[in-house]
Amino acid sequence: MLPSRYRLRRSSDFKAVLRRGRRVAGRYIVVYLSTSDTDRPGPQAGFVVGRNVGGAVVRNRIRRRLRHIVAARLAVIPARKRIVVRALPAAAAASFAELAAEFDRLLGRLTQTKNSQGTS
């Protein structure tokens, strides 16, 4: 379970991350990352699972899986960052392992520094 202090709750917070954040997309999810305006010490995460993903049972299952994936990786997410994870319709058919692997890959792409992207 993702502790409440690490969750994004207000729609204005979601909108700020979606507007100002960097974005990378995969087959199952889209991850947005932005710097927090507040002085909270840890990262915050929010989840968007729209009706195009499936019915209520499917959407809630995907949301629970995504929350569990992010909660297990709180130590890896940089402090004072906000993340929004948006599920795509293909996420309904994805396994937990596929969602976790894709989140790790996309988060890695977002958190790379410009120095590590240079040529050797």
Curated annotation (Swiss-Prot):
Matching HAMAP family: RNase_P
SUPFAM superfamilies: Ribosomal protein S5 domain 2-like
Example of a GO MF term: tRNA binding
NCBIfam families found in the cross-reference section: rnpA
Role played: RNaseP catalyzes the removal of the 5'-leader sequence from pre-tRNA to produce the mature 5'-terminus. It can also cleave other RNA substrates such as 4.5S RNA. The protein component plays an auxiliary but essential role in vivo by binding to the 5'-leader sequence and broadening the substrate specificity of the ribozyme.
Reactions catalysed: Endonucleolytic cleavage of RNA, removing 5'-extranucleotides from tRNA precursor
Record's protein name: Ribonuclease P protein component
Family membership noted in the UniProt record: Belongs to the RnpA family.
Pfam families: Ribonuclease_P (PF00825)
Signal peptide interval: none
UniProt KW keywords: Endonuclease, Hydrolase, Nuclease, RNA-binding, tRNA processing
Record text on subunit structure and interactions: Consists of a catalytic RNA component (M1 or rnpB) and a protein subunit.
Leading EC class: hydrolase
GO biological-process terms attached to the record: tRNA 5'-leader removal
EC number(s) reported in the record: 3.1.26.5
Lineage top rank: taxon: Bacteria
Listed GO CC annotations: ribonuclease P complex
